[in-house]
């Protein structure tokens, strides 16, 4: 390593979306010659090895997840258990504090990056190490959601001083935020909002995968609120895939004309209720466009096949696939036949979509997803959101069809605006030198 090289420890939340996001930023640091020590659950390393692009600089440090009563043996990440057990994983992660302290004393890094371990800043400070709360969600989401409110209705609108924006929540979304923030015990006897506010208040800086051109006002709001630097890594674009699209999907997509296929994916953990699962795919059928939906089986079903509406498979056999397994999302999004991406609005998925040419249909569910949807659909005007019921949060097949047609059909005025805005943002994000400039500042 050079004289100016940094030693950085990464300790992300035990969820695959967080682990891969932290590894992505680790690859960027390694490109600049910095050394990374990446702490993760033992058996999870094999799932991440292929994404470590600089194994000579990024060293995985596997640790054993402490046993907590109620957790099945062998549990390591949120992918191993249903949502109600997540708090037990958080408790297990808190129990790793002595192990983390020992590692920090041994490694003597300049910085430690973390997200959910609210106790890490105080530990790092005692050891003379700077801590960075690296957020896997957007600055807009943190600015809107990180507040301790007494009632759900407070989340219908933004907090005082929030920048002018289209961002607000519907009643069903506000209730969901209130439940996560103030009702659901979030491990070790702490509420989610308490843990997140402590992490933000105690760290030395907060880091984001974003840029000023897209979210500058929200970063300024956060700097004033938490009185510390907001460091931006830039868009942190997905690495060019080293693999090729599976022949099965390449062959299937190749049979359709350019920009004609709907692709739908809701991430590795999201599961719909059966009736909403059926409304979604029936909406795709109504559009008349070919579609590929990569979805987990709905709640209560073992497979996607058993949850298909009666006669659906026969009616759509020539132009539709509902797949219950993992797919190469980044490669599918870049395929020339794909014209529309129906997304749950996870920040990582939106980042991948913004640098591709497919248009966005926004169907958020929980957490930061509604904020991301309003940012993309309202402030940036790069997507169309599927309408939902204000109280119950339910969508219909007709709502899905209408949103898809708005972005896909050439004679749609809204679609023309969306396509123009998306093209402008894509050109900006791919501009030569943009990401490198941001990341140089991030490292300094």
Predicted regions and their residues:
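Glycosyltransferase specificity loop/lid
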Residues: 1-444
